[in-house]
């Protein structure tokens, strides 16, 4: 609240923050209509932001419109809420590199839906894709994570837990931490009695 007060956003009689021009601090949060989990998250966020004096409007669309038009063509004014998954070491080029911002010129290709641009991140993503030395990759990933945490191009809400069911006779298999099973470290697998 103090940061908003200092920035000139004071609460009116209804508890909504207004700037000096009398404009409310208001934005939309969008997701797919009918997705109960996301709709509940929207309601919680709306309630929490209201306590801070921010007017959040919930605006949802059918999935075919939300993903087929709104998200890919970047037609949301503030926040679009959806989930995505990736492997633990997938380089997030399509979501973070400025070359992957969907535009009319590239026929809406890429998944950098927020329009995030950072030349340092671009260079880092390009190096990570080709670096094979494990120690060097670790340093690069730490740099990437620090830039991400500073710039916050997307706001992760939570990580989904995925069940990983293994047969009792199989040993040495390490769950991947994401929904896709993998044959990584297959040399460690063994059939046991």
Where are these regions (language model features)?
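Detector for C-terminal structural segments
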Residues: 1, 37-47, 64-193
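Short, well-structured beta-strand/strand-turn elements
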Residues: 8-14, 50-66
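Short, well-ordered beta-strand elements
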Residues: 24-34, 56-59, 78-81
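Envelope-exposed proteins and targeting segments
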Residues: 25, 52-54, 153
């Amino acid at each position: 609240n103090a940061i908003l007060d200092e920035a000139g956003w004071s609460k009116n009689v209804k508890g909504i923050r207004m700037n000096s021009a009398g404009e409310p601090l208001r934005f939309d949060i969008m997701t797919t209509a009918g997705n109960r989990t996301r709709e509940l998250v929207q309601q919680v966020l709306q309630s929490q932001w209201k306590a801070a004096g921010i007017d959040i409007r919930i605006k949802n669309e059918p999935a075919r419109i939300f993903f087929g038009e709104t998200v890919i063509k970047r037609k949301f004014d503030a926040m679009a809420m959806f989930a995505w998954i990736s492997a633990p070491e997938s380089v997030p080029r399509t979501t973070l590199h400025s070359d992957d911002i969907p535009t009319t010129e590239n026929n809406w290709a890429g998944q950098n839906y927020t329009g995030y641009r950072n030349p340092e991140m671009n260079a880092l993503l390009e190096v990570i894709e080709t670096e094979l030395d494990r120690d060097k990759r670790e340093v690069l990933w730490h740099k990437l994570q620090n830039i991400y945490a500073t710039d916050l191009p997307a706001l992760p809400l939570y990580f989904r837990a995925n069940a990983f069911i293994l047969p009792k006779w199989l040993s040495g298999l390490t769950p991947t931490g994401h929904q896709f099973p993998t044959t990584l470290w297959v040399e460690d697998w063994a059939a046991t009695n």
